[in-house]
A protein has these predicted regions:
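N-terminal maturation segment of proteins
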Residues: 42-616
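N-terminal targeting leaders characterized by basic, low-complexity, disordered sequences
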Residues: 1-5
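Short, glycine/alanine-rich hydrophobic alpha-helices that insert into or span membranes
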Residues: 28-32
């Protein structure tokens, strides 16, 4: 049997079945990227800006800068964990007064949208023509983001932060593990935040109670998965060598600005916070979520809930911002599935020996550091240069292995760019999967994109409003193209690449099918069988994953196809003047925006490229 398993693919597929049906199916596309971005100069110099005043050019409208900076300060200070993830020194950005809290949902005013309408009024007061080019892009981004948020604000009860794999109960320990200690204040605030875990979870449970009354609680099997992850964390949180106590102690031991006595005091305070707040918080989740079992009234995809189809549309509009209906997305996926299938068939006709080589395909490297360095060398022809960046590769705690995503990238603080962390889940990622995984998370994926855009000194607000379709679409786009950097057998590389890209498209089809068209598990299984994949267990896992996180797979895959469609348009417009490296530079310098915005500004970039090529 010929098989392929990639970094976000759990199940294997038979290539012969694929040839019979002109398709294949496996896998999953579940990854999270946490935190936000910062800046490095394009020329590789060592300069860094230290406050907001250094970021803007003379062509900017200063009033608009003041508005967006004010919005940034308000959003960034909504909770201290996010604030610290964004800024090491908030006071240098005008943020001096903030509560040390993980944040709260205002249950009593949960449907109040006055803040959004106020932002819209202030934004619309600006004449877009008076803004610089970069400000106009920011204007369009904010306009789309705010109106989309407002238009779907009545559907808040359909959302939950407590889900398998990407739920906050899993992400919170990882966020704490990446909390930087640069001064004594950081250690104190960390312990204060740790002491707020139970209060934070109790607030989330108040919100979940509202969902339960409406019958919106997760299905019992999904609740069991969330509860299981909470139990694993609660059971290990108090371990002397665990992620909350052992990791903290070793980090504190390395802090040269603390005396030995201070280290011992903080270690004791941290342990007390874990015992008295973290573990009780997770136990509260376990007990209360268990009490919600049996209250779900709507089985299947989100479209089966009241206004669920509209909610799914809103999820895609928010993360993609692409002027397409769900039917058009579905048709787009069909066209790419056909295209990839045709290419694969042609490759196998051209070289039938690819059949036997397919199952043994390998990048030839399985050490993370070596893979990153190999990618940095091989991407130079296709992607613009970036100065060297520090990074760390870590492994997810054993307690989270069965629940966390295959890999994650934690973005650096705006004013402390040198801490870039990639986490690998050793359970969810085999060594053979590491190359495309690190292309996704590292070069030329999240790490590279984050640092490159930061080098353009973007407006502060661009660090907190970043459409997921761009972020994850870019990482998926470069992950697919990383197969071009394998061995010298370009035909085999293309075969494996097309197989993986096709798999992603089928996964997005399943997401739409279940969550918008209302496919049952049996219908999903039938769909997979049509493409030569007959595992009932895999179909069940996929169906459950689609229900747990509506539109999550579409965010990755349709974002990826958005860049492919943008590239097709640029190639059509430019002909021989098209440059892949310059096309990537356009995407990277524009930064995280909705796909429509990338298309809107494409012609301006094309005109500049033609002029510069003629001048050369």
């Amino acid at each position: 049997m010929l098989t392929l398993k990639s970094s976000y693919i759990k199940h294997k597929t038979n290539i012969y079945s694929f040839l019979k049906k002109a398709a294949a199916i496996t896998g999953a596309v579940v990854i999270t990227a946490c935190s936000f971005s910062a800046c490095t100069p394009l020329d590789g110099s060592a300069s860094r800006y230290n406050n907001a005043d250094e970021q803007y050019n003379a062509a900017d409208n200063e009033s608009f800068n003041a508005f967006t900076d004010s919005l940034f300060r308000e959003l960034a200070s909504s909770d201290s964990l996010s604030l610290h993830a964004l800024l090491e020194n908030p006071s240098e950005y005008g943020i001096d007064d903030y509560d040390i809290t993980l944040g709260r949902i205002d249950i009593d005013n949960i449907d109040d949208t006055s803040d959004i309408t106020d932002y819209i009024t202030k934004l619309n007061a600006f004449d877009k023509a008076s803004l610089s080019k970069s400000q106009q892009i920011t204007y369009d981004l904010l306009n789309k983001y705010l109106y989309t948020t407002l238009n779907y604000s009545d559907l808040y009860l359909l959302n939950t932060d407590l889900t398998p794999t990407i739920g906050i109960q899993i992400q919170l320990p990882l966020l704490f593990s990446e909390y930087t200690f640069m001064e004594k204040k950081d250690v104190k605030e960390y312990i204060q935040l740790l002491s707020d875990v139970d209060g934070y979870f109790n607030n989330l449970l108040e919100f979940e109670a509202l969902r339960s009354v409406r019958g919106y609680t997760l299905s019992d099997d999904l609740l069991d998965e969330v509860i299981s992850s909470c139990k694993s964390i609660a059971d290990s949180a108090g371990d002397a060598e665990g992620m909350f106590i052992g990791t903290f102690n070793s980090r504190v031991d390395d802090l040269i600005f603390l005396t030995d006595d201070e280290k011992n005091v903080y270690k004791k305070q941290n342990e007390d916070a874990v015992i008295n707040h973290v573990i009780p918080g997770y136990n509260a989740l376990i007990t209360t979520l268990a009490s919600f079992k049996g209250t779900n009234q709507y089985s299947g995809g989100i479209c089966n809930y009241p206004d669920g189809a509209r909610y799914f549309e809103g999820l895609l509009e928010n993360c993609l911002g692409w002027s397409k209906s769900i039917d058009e997305y579905n048709d787009l996926l069909d066209s790419y599935i056909r295209s990839y299938a045709i290419v694969m068939q042609k490759l196998l006709r051209k070289d039938p020996s690819l059949n036997s080589q397919f199952g043994t395909f390998s990048f030839g490297i399985d050490k993370p550091d070596q893979i990153i360095e190999d990618l940095k060398k091989k991407i130079t022809d296709d992607y613009p240069a970036l100065s060297d960046v520090n990074y760390n590769i870590n492994y997810v705690s054993e307690a989270l292995n069965d629940y966390a995503s295959p890999a994650m990238y934690f973005m650096p603080q705006i004013d402390n760019l040198d801490i870039n962390s990639i986490y690998i889940n050793s359970t969810g990622t085999d060594s053979s999967d590491l190359y495309p995984t690190l292309a996704h998370e590292g070069y030329p994926g999240h790490l590279y994109q984050t640092q490159y855009f930061a080098s353009t000194s973007p407006s502060l607000i661009r660090n907190v409003i970043k459409p997921g379709g761009y972020i994850e679409g870019w990482a998926s786009y470069v992950e697919v193209h990383s197969y071009e950097y394998a061995g010298d057998n370009t035909l085999l590389n293309s075969l494996v690449q097309c197989n993986y890209a096709l798999i992603l498209c089928l996964y997005a089809k399943g997401d739409i099918g279940v969550n918008y068209y209302g496919w049952t598990e049996a219908q999903l299984s039938s769909f997979l069988t049509d493409y030569g994949f007959n595992s009932a267990e895999a179909a069940h896992e996929m169906y459950t994953a689609f229900i747990a996180n509506p539109a999550n797979y579409c965010k990755y895959v349709l974002g990826f196809l958005g860049f492919e469609e943008l590239k097709k348009q640029a190639q059509k417009d430019l002909g021989d003047n098209f440059s892949l490296k310059e096309f990537h530079r356009y995407i990277l310098e524009t930064g995280p925006v909705h796909i429509d915005i990338l298309f809107d500004y494409l012609k301006n970039w094309e005109n500049r490229l033609v002029v510069s090529s003629r001048a050369a």
